[in-house]
Swiss-Prot record:
Organism: Streptococcus pneumoniae serotype 19F (strain G54)
Official protein name in the record: ATP-dependent Clp protease ATP-binding subunit ClpX
NCBIfam families listed in its UniProt record: clpX (TIGR00382), PRK05342.1 (NF003745)
Known role: ATP-dependent specificity component of the Clp protease. It directs the protease to specific substrates. Can perform chaperone functions in the absence of ClpP.
The keyword RNA-binding is assigned to this record: no
Higher taxonomy: Bacteria, Bacillati, Bacillota, Bacilli, Lactobacillales
Length: 410
C-alpha cells in the first residue's frame, strides 16, 4: 500500500521519463515537467544550432571589391585605407571559415589580420570600423584605451572590452567570438620613452601588455556584471582567437619620427633630402619602427600586421561628406524638415563655409554635425510653427552668422 502511494507521488520528466530520484532536479510547468538533464541537453542543441547559424553567415563574407563598394556608399575619401581594411576583413573571416572546415591533419596556421589605423581626429577611423561591422552583420564594440588600466589599479580592466561585445551580441558567446572590437586612442597609452621605466606605468606599457593577450588570442574570464573580478563572481569564458581587433589613434607627432628616419636614410646614401609638404604624405610612409619609437611595444605591433593610414580630410572631402554618402548630414536634415512639408537647400558656398569651420576647429568630419546644429537651431525651432513656409535656403552668411536663412512661403 505504501509503495503504491509513493509511486503516485513520484514526479517524472515529461521528456525522458526519469523520475525525481534518478535526476538532480525536476522543474514543474503547465501540465509538464522537465529534468535538469533534459534542460542541459536542450541548451547544447540550441548552442550547436547557433554556432551553425553564425558560421553560415560568415561563409558568405563579401569579397574585398564588394566590401570597398559598401564602404564607398558611406565613407568619402581614404581610398588606400578602405582597400587595406577590405582585404584584412575578408582575409580574417576567410581564415575563420578555413579553420572550421579544414582537416585536422593540415598544419597551416593562419594568423589574425588585426588592424592598426593611424589618422588625425575626425578622419573617419571609428566610422570605417562601424561601417564594416554593420555590412558584415557581426557584433561591434568600441573601447577607449585611455579608460583602461593595468590589473590591480583603479580603472577598467581590458576584459570589460569583451563584456561590451557580449552585451551587443545579447550574450550569445558564439556570435561575440566572431565580432569586431575597435580600440580607440591607442596612441594615448604609448610609453613615454623607448627606455624601460623603473616606475610602474599604470596606463602605458602595462595596459599594452594586457591588451596584447586578448588581441593575440586567449580564453578570457569576463565578469558578466562588469567591474573588478572577485573570487565569488561567476565568469563567462570568451575565446578571442577569432575576434577581429581594429586599433586606432591620431599619433600626433609621428610624422616627425618618419621625417627623421627618412632624412637619416637619405643622407646615409649621399642624396639630398626631398621635403614633403603635407604630413599626410609622411603618414603613408609609416613603418613598424616608427610606431615603436612613438611608444607602442613591439609585441603589440607584431599582433597588428595591417597598417591603414588615413589622411587629413580636405575642404573638398568635407563638402562631399556633407552631401554624398547614403546617410549624409544634409540628407538627414532635409528628411527632418520634410516631415513638416518644408524643403531644405544648402548653397554650395554654405557647404564650403561649414567645411572651412571644421578645418579651423581641427575636428574633421566629426565636427560637421555640431556646426550644422548651430546653423540650423533657429530654423528647426521656428519653422515647424510657420505653416506657410515651404522652403528654407541656407547661405554662406547663414553659416557665418551674418544673416538669417532665406525662407520662401506658399
Amino acid at each position: 500500500m505504501s509503495t503504491n502511494r509513493k509511486n503516485d507521488m513520484m514526479v517524472y520528466c515529461s521528456f525522458c521519463g526519469k523520475n525525481q530520484e534518478e535526476v538532480q532536479k525536476i522543474i514543474a510547468g503547465n501540465n509538464a515537467f522537465i529534468c535538469n538533464e533534459c534542460v542541459e541537453l536542450a541548451q547544447e542543441i540550441i548552442r550547436e544550432e547557433l554556432v551553425e547559424e553564425v558560421l553560415a553567415d560568415l561563409s558568405e563574407v563579401p569579397k574585398p571589391i564588394e566590401l570597398l563598394h559598401i564602404l564607398n556608399h558611406y565613407v568619402i575619401g581614404q581610398d588606400r585605407a578602405k582597400r587595406a581594411l577590405a582585404v584584412a576583413v575578408y582575409n580574417h573571416y576567410k581564415r575563420i571559415n578555413f579553420h572550421d572546415t579544414r582537416e585536422e591533419s593540415e598544419d597551416v596556421d593562419l594568423q589574425k589580420s588585426n588592424i592598426l589605423m593611424i589618422g588625425p581626429t575626425g578622419s573617419g577611423k571609428t566610422f570605417l570600423a562601424q561601417t564594416l561591422a554593420k555590412s558584415l552583420n557581426v557584433p561591434f564594440a568600441i573601447a577607449d584605451a585611455t579608460a583602461l588600466t593595468e590589473a590591480g589599479y583603479v580603472g577598467e580592466d581590458v576584459e570589460n572590452i569583451l563584456l561590451k561585445l557580449l552585451q551587443v551580441a545579447d550574450f550569445n558567446i558564439e556570435r561575440a567570438e566572431r565580432g569586431i572590437i575597435y580600440v580607440d586612442e591607442i596612441d594615448k597609452i604609448a610609453k613615454k620613452s623607448e627606455n624601460v621605466s623603473i616606475t610602474r606605468d599604470v596606463s602605458g606599457e602595462g595596459v599594452q601588455q594586457a591588451l596584447l593577450k586578448i588581441i593575440e588570442g586567449t580564453v578570457a574570464s569576463v565578469p558578466p556584471q562588469g567591474g573588478r573580478k572577485h573570487p565569488q563572481q561567476e565568469m563567462i569564458q570568451v575565446d578571442t582567437k577569432n575576434i577581429l581587433f581594429i586599433v586606432g589613434g591620431a599619433f600626433d607627432g609621428i610624422e616627425e619620427i618618419v621625417k627623421q628616419r627618412m632624412g637619416e636614410k637619405v643622407i646615409g646614401f649621399g642624396q639630398n633630402n626631398k621635403a614633403i609638404d603635407e604630413n599626410s604624405s609622411y603618414m603613408q610612409e609609416i613603418i613598424a619602427e616608427d610606431i615603436q619609437k612613438f611608444g607602442i611595444i613591439p609585441e603589440l605591433i607584431g599582433r597588428l600586421p595591417v597598417f591603414a593610414a588615413l589622411e587629413q580630410l580636405t575642404v573638398d572631402d568635407l563638402v562631399r561628406i556633407l552631401k554624398e554618402p547614403r546617410n549624409a548630414l544634409v540628407k538627414q536634415y532635409q528628411t527632418l524638415l520634410s516631415y513638416d512639408d518644408v524643403e531644405l537647400e544648402f548653397d554650395d558656398e554654405a557647404l564650403q563655409e561649414i567645411a572651412n569651420k571644421a578645418i579651423e576647429r581641427k575636428t574633421g568630419a566629426r565636427g560637421l554635425r555640431s556646426i550644422i546644429e548651430e546653423t540650423m537651431l533657429d530654423v528647426m525651432f521656428e519653422v515647424p510653427s510657420q505653416e506657410n513656409v515651404k522652403l528654407v535656403r541656407i547661405t554662406k552668411e547663414t553659416v557665418d552668422g551674418t544673416d538669417k536663412p532665406i525662407l520662401e512661403t506658399a
